[in-house]
Amino acid sequence: MSEAFDCAKCNESLYGRKYIQTDSGPYCVPCYDNTFANTCAECQQLIGHDSRELFYEDRHFHEGCFRCCRCQRSLADEPFTCQDSELLCNECYCTAFSSQCSACGETVMPGSRKLEYGGQTWHEHCFLCSGCEQPLGSRSFVPDKGAHYCVPCYENKFAPRCARCSKTLTQGGVTYRDQPWHRECLVCTGCKTPLAGQQFTSRDDDPYCVACFGELFAPKCSSCKRPITGGSGGGEGAGLGGGKYVSFEDRHWHHSCFSCARCSTSLVGQGFVPDGDQVLCQGCSQAGP
């Protein structure tokens, strides 16, 4: 008598039948499938021993059931995305859920590098500076009326330009004759001393510090021969630095220098008598030589 060779579950003889050997013993094919096979998450049928089984996120599928839920394309050898537990091929996912690039109008594929700003989406290689047309990537940019500029292009296009060097002012600066200047560009035409924050004047639109303007253009005091910085014209006036002066005919004096050539009495606001290159008070003039 031959030794018994039965299925470990149904106890039916396996002689002459197909069976599957396991650690716990041999099983006929139906018992093996009922005992060990996984249930397909799509069709809810057992995945038999002779079926190709696919596994994704704790779920098991027949190869034929592993499909895009929209177009039914097999995903066995295709890239796919899971959205709300549903499997979608990349094409269907992009159509349903992906954004369109605001520049080229093409779909921004899942996993691709993209940039989002102001509710819009771009491929990384499509987000370009409106000036130089170079990719902005992670660089700083300035939005302007729907355009986007890298900082150098924005400054070159929109920033004010210095009246002296014509280069853009990116920060600070001063205003002279209603025009912007770099602080370092507003210097005395004579000695090149910076004039920002200092008192200065101009001649023929060129700025000068008080000292250079006096040396170059101001009339000289008839007494001390030093320059008088201020306005021109007869009578009394105020110099550029606030110092007062006196003019008579073609001669000029500092207030402190306008005095009688003999007795040194100040003649400011007093009557005086010219005597050649000198001026005398009335008393000294009447006293004679």
UniProtKB/Swiss-Prot annotation:
The UniProt entry, under PROSITE patterns, shows: LIM_DOMAIN_1, LIM_DOMAIN_2
Q: Which domain of life is it from?
A: Eukaryota
Which residue intervals define the domain LIM zinc-binding in the entry? 40-92, 101-153, 162-212, 221-275
Note the zinc finger regions (C4-type) by start and end residue. 7-31
Keywords, A to Z, come to: Acetylation, Activator, Cytoplasm, LIM domain, Metal-binding, Nucleus, Repeat, Transcription, Transcription regulation, Zinc, Zinc-finger
Q: In which tissues is it expressed?
A: Expressed in myogenic progenitor cells (at protein level). Expressed in skeletal striated muscle and the heart. Expressed to a lesser extent, in lung, and kidney. Expressed in skin and skeletal muscles such as the masseter, tongue, tibialis anterior and plantar muscles.
Q: Name one GO molecular function term.
A: zinc ion binding
Q: Name one GO cellular component term.
A: stress fiber
| InterPro entries recorded | LIM_FHL1/2/3/5_N, Znf_LIM
Q: How does it assemble?
A: Interacts with SOX15; the interaction recruits FHL3 to FOXK1 promoters where it acts as a transcriptional coactivator of FOXK1.
Q: What does this protein do?
A: Recruited by SOX15 to FOXK1 promoters where it acts as a transcriptional coactivator of FOXK1.
The name under which this protein is listed is Four and a half LIM domains protein 3
Biological classification of the source: Eukaryota, Metazoa, Chordata, Craniata, Vertebrata
